[in-house]
Amino acid sequence: MFRALIGDLFESQAQTLVNTVNCVGVMGKGVAEQFKRRFPEMFEDYKSRTDRKALRLGEPYLYRDSSGVQIVNFPTKDHWRSPSRLADVERGLDYLAAHAAGWEITSLALPPLGCGNGGLEWSEVGPLIYQKLHDLPIDIELFAPYGTPKQQLTEEFLSAPSQMSLEGRGRKHVPLRPEWVVLMEVLRELEAQPYASPVGRTIFQKIS
């Protein structure tokens, strides 16, 4: 079962929690800071991995300790100062989906990967996470950013065809219509005339 909700990730009863991290060993903000305070041994393990340059975008890893704590540290950005990229989140989700069975994950709770300090939009991240994980045979709780409209927590919203740009951030590129290309070429030729006046709004409207 897959469900999106608003609430406290740490109150989830899921077997495995997902933490968003960078690749330089800093957990200074957001949900990562809370993970650091709650699970200091996990942070030391994470810091050791980053010191060895063993953590890469697109390759989350499972941390498990003797007490039964299971945390997936999921890199959403290279440096903590950098924005998150949707393409990196997608690669990480593919990796997580491929390893979930091997990691013996029976239930999963995760934050809105790359949103907040990462700068990504829930309207892109939520549907992407649903697309990549909803078919897994486990219970999944996806915690949306506070203030997310209820309609954007529904399966109808999450399963709708997205307009994601996996080159990074923002919406899908819209191809230029042929008439726009012709118009741009006319404007370019006008501007190239040696004694041409600048093309103002009136002339532009007449050409259009």
Predicted regions and their residues:
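Macrodomain-like recognition of ADP-ribose-binding/processing modules
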Residues: 1-180, 186-205
